[in-house]
UniProtKB/Swiss-Prot annotation:
It comes from Arabidopsis thaliana. Gene3D superfamilies: Tetratricopeptide repeat domain (1.25.40.10). One of its GO terms (cellular component) is mitochondrion. PPR repeats lie at residues 372-406, 407-441, 442-476, 477-511, 512-542, 544-574, 578-612. This is Pentatricopeptide repeat-containing protein At4g04790, mitochondrial.
Length: 821
């Protein structure tokens, strides 16, 4: 049955329990003319009414003004609405806590408008309109022009309906939006529009996840009527439905249609049934079906890949080998053997990369087939995803030796992996690979190589790559020069950076907004900032958000704080960027001594309920005045919503308290936030290491605070203190000449099951010397191995620094700081 207001109560109770909310995404964009937009929607989006006029009018009048509808026209227009869709509530009920990140990520990947630029653009427009007018007004407005909507607009609107349903934890609200999406599908059918899988797939996936069987079939019927060619693909979703519900009888009914004894190829519908079974690892049903299916009759390459992924996940070597031999002996199947070997070998659970490569090579040898470029590409990507970049480079070099083409995608995987593992020196091997004839790079590959060369300060290599472009019939672009420009600025080599700009012009490459952003951001004089900004305008380069950010940073760095503030009032600055630019201004002012001004801007934004970048709030905490109130920083930390930002800001506030003699409330603050500190996935232990380091370097040492924190970690949080924590605390005992607490810390090493290494012995030795226990120090030092010259040196320096000289004026003691690494 179709979801409607009269039958909502008939839905299964499972639906209500499965409503999964998420956070609201704020996407805003300008309303420019877009190809494929119906004239009615264009007229709606091109309204010239000012925001002030709209604010003064009622919600109903605001929508009427946008649509250019007079009061007298409303009643007649409303009678002729094409879609009879109930109005929305103005605000969306959200509850973030009940929806997992994994499900959110999975649904984002299925988003209707993700694969189509126009649909994505329209979705932004719909969201932006809802944000400004309210959802009720926005959907009512677009409802008025529904008769003239294009396919692209239908698709985008369906996507927004689904998104709102997914985000809500309100049953009626979610059902209402699914009903509206259904009405749009019916409208598309009635107008003769095809409904594509990228539109109906996420809708059916949502219904499957909510156990809505009747609704699933209603949607499926409309889709089949609108797009008869989708019948076979709808079988895939039907199989997913029964798998999700665990209905073995229905699954078996569909499986019974798959017969491999007739010698004919599988139908498209049968292949879709098999594909769903493989996707969901239905081992019981697949075990029987794969015995009767003729693998050489499978026409879908996607199904073949999924079959071998399934076989790899369950390590079904004998079945995989049989299928590969059958394909090897067939005229068409032999073309796929190498690719299927790579899929199978890389899907085997828990192997090392080395084992995977051995299996890859062995299977190719047994089947007497040569590895293909695409199979090597899969192997390279697998190695890169496993962070085995050196191994991936070895594979690529073998490809070159075999004369196989090294594609731009392979180079991209390598370059991305090098960036991820921070082994920038490996770019030199990429450079040597590029010298072979079997490489087909693109401009993005060159840009990445040039950027990595600058990271290792190999500017000569970066310029060599620019020279190599002509060997591949490629032209240099501004992004390549910008990488070199950024590298020189990073090295504070301004003269060479300016030379890059000159070289760009000589090469016929026009500087872009990023180029001017780098130039402005690295200016230290107001006149230079003005010069580059004027040059940018004369060159016809449009000022972007990044340019305005660079202006703010540059003016603040040159001490022109009022100029930095004036950037925000520039009439050319889009209103949509105001909050981001204010956040940048807060960070720029706070980091350059204008903390009070930064705090004032933040408080104004907070009162206006504007979004502030968490990094800006953290900057306020980090650069706060040492004479400031701790309560202000506590409030700032509390304002941080997401856990990652909060933990960063909270512990920066704790560090401020330790370093500025405001530590009396630290333990209370920790206890107050105990629940949040215990949240899974928050790296609390590493932050405690920093706090103990601050305690160790503070004069006078706050050993009592350190011991209180140690007890809190153990008793309240259930943490085992790290070795670093104990090392820093023991060092604090040295500074405080506190033998009593030093001995307690020494016992903590044993409680935490940390073996006392040489560094631990040396620190305890220093505690004994500093506290004047020469006998204890002598006994302990006898147990320290003295084979290492550095250890001998530290012992001698410690004896000198802590020796007693009662008849002479004591010089300031030199501290021997030991590494905690």
């Amino acid at each position: 049955m179709v979801v409607s207001k009269v039958n909502k109560s008939l839905l299964s109770s499972v639906f209500k329990s499965r409503i999964r909310p998420t956070g609201e995404s704020s996407i805003a964009s300008g309303n420019k003319d877009i190809a494929g937009t119906s004239q009615a929607v264009k007229d709606l989006l091109s309204s010239k009414n000012s925001s002030s006029d709209l604010e003064e009018a009622s919600l109903q009048d605001r929508v009427s003004k946008l649509l250019h509808v007079t009061t007298s026209d409303k009643s007649s227009l409303e009678k002729n609405l094409f879609l009879k869709i109930p109005s929305f509530t103005t605000k969306i009920p959200y509850d973030i806590s009940l929806r997992t990140k994994e499900l959110s990520r999975e649904r984002k990947e299925r988003r209707v408008y993700k694969q189509n630029g126009l649909s994505r653009r329209f979705a932004k427009i719909f969201r932006d309109s809802a944000q400004k007018l309210g959802t009720e007004a926005m959907f009512g407005a677009f409802d008025r022009v529904a008769k003239e909507m294009s396919v692209t607009e239908y698709n985008a609107m369906i996507g927004v309906y689904l998104e709102h349903a997914e985000k809500s934890n309100d049953l009626d609200y979610a059902l209402g939006h699914i009903e509206k999406a259904f009405e749009l599908l019916k409208s598309m059918r009635d107008r003769g529009f095809l409904i594509e899988e990228r539109v109906y797939g996420p809708l059916l996936g949502y219904l499957i996840g909510m156990d809505m069987v009747d609704e699933f079939h209603s949607f499926k019927d409309v889709i089949r009527e609108a797009s008869p060619g989708s019948v076979e693909r709808l079988g895939y979703y039907e199989m997913l439905l029964w798998i999700h519900l665990g209905d073995g009888e229905k699954i078996e009914e569909l499986c019974s249609t798959i017969d491999g004894d007739n010698g004919e190829s599988l139908s498209v519908l049968q292949e879709n049934y098999l594909l769903a079974l493989c996707k969901k690892d239905q081992k019981y049903h697949l075990e029987r079906l794969l015995e009767i299916v003729d693998i050489t009759k499978v026409r879908s390459s996607d199904l073949l890949a999924n079959i071998f992924e399934y076989l790899g996940r369950f390590s079904l070597d004998s079945v995989a080998s049989r299928f590969l031999w059958e394909l090897r002996e067939s005229d068409e199947g032999v073309k796929n053997v190498s690719d299927l070997i790579s899929i199978y070998s890389t899907c085997t659970p828990n192997p090392t990369v080395e084992d995977t490569i051995l299996k890859f090579n062995k299977m190719h040898e047994e089947l007497d087939v040569m590895p293909s470029s695409t199979s090597y590409e899969k192997l390279v990507k697998y190695s890169c995803d496993s962070n085995e970049v050196v191994t991936a480079l070895d594979v690529v070099e073998k490809m070159g030796e075999a004369g196989l083409m090294i594609s731009a995608d392979i180079l991209h995987s390598l370059l991305h992996a090098i960036d991820e593992v921070l082994e920038f020196d490996l770019v030199r091997r990429i450079h040597s690979i590029m010298c072979t004839k079997s490489v087909k790079p693109n401009t993005e590959n060159f840009r990445s190589i040039i950027r990595l060369c600058t990271r290792i300060k190999d500017f000569e290599g970066a310029y060599n790559m620019l020279g190599n472009l002509k060997n591949f019939n490629l032209e240099p672009n501004s992004s390549m020069f910008n990488c070199i420009l950024a590298g020189y600025f990073r090295e504070k080599n301004v003269s060479s950076a300016l030379m890059v700009v000159k070289q760009m012009k000589e090469a016929g490459v026009k500087p872009d907004s990023i180029t001017f952003g780098y130039l402005i951001n690295n200016c230290t004089q107001e006149d230079a900032i003005t010069k580059y900004y004027e040059e940018m305008k004369q060159a016809g380069v449009q000022a972007t958000k990044r340019i305005y950010m660079s202006l703010i940073d540059a003016y603040a760095a040159s001490g022109k704080f009022e100029k930095a503030k004036q950037v925000l009032v520039d009439p050319d600055v889009p209103a949509i960027n105001q909050n981001e630019l204010k956040s940048v201004l807060i960070s720029a002012l706070a980091s350059r001594g204008k903390w009070a001004d930064a705090l004032h801007i933040y408080e104004e934004m907070r009162k206006a309920e504007c979004h502030v970048d968490p990094k800006s709030i953290i900057s306020l905490i980090e650069y706060s005045d040492s004479k400031g109130e701790l309560s202000t920083l506590v409030q700032l930390a509390d304002d941080l919503q997401d856990d990652t930002s909060w933990i960063d800001g909270f512990f920066r506030m704790i560090l401020f308290a330790v370093r500025n003699k405001k530590s009396s409330d630290i333990v209370d603050l920790l206890k107050r936030n105990k629940v949040r500190l215990l949240k899974k996935g928050i790296p609390v232990e590493a932050h405690f290491d920093e706090v103990f380091w601050a305690i160790a370097e503070t004069e006078p040492s706050k050993v009592h605070l350190g011991m209180d924190l140690l007890r809190f970690m153990k008793d309240e949080l259930g943490f085992v203190p790290s070795r670093k924590c104990l090392d820093f605390l023991l060092h604090a005992c040295v500074n405080a000449k506190d033998l009593e607490h030093g001995l307690l810390v020494w016992k903590e090493y044993q409680s935490a099951a940390f073996p006392c290494n040489v560094l631990s012995f040396l620190r305890m030795y220093q505690v004994l010397l500093a506290a004047g226990d020469s006998e204890g120090a002598k006994a302990l030092v006898s147990k320290i191995p003295k084979d290492d010259k550095d250890v001998q040196h530290i012992i001698e320096e410690s004896q000198s620094a802590f020796s007693q000289a009662p008849n002479k004026k004591k010089p300031k003691k030199k501290m021997i700081v030991l590494s905690t690494k």
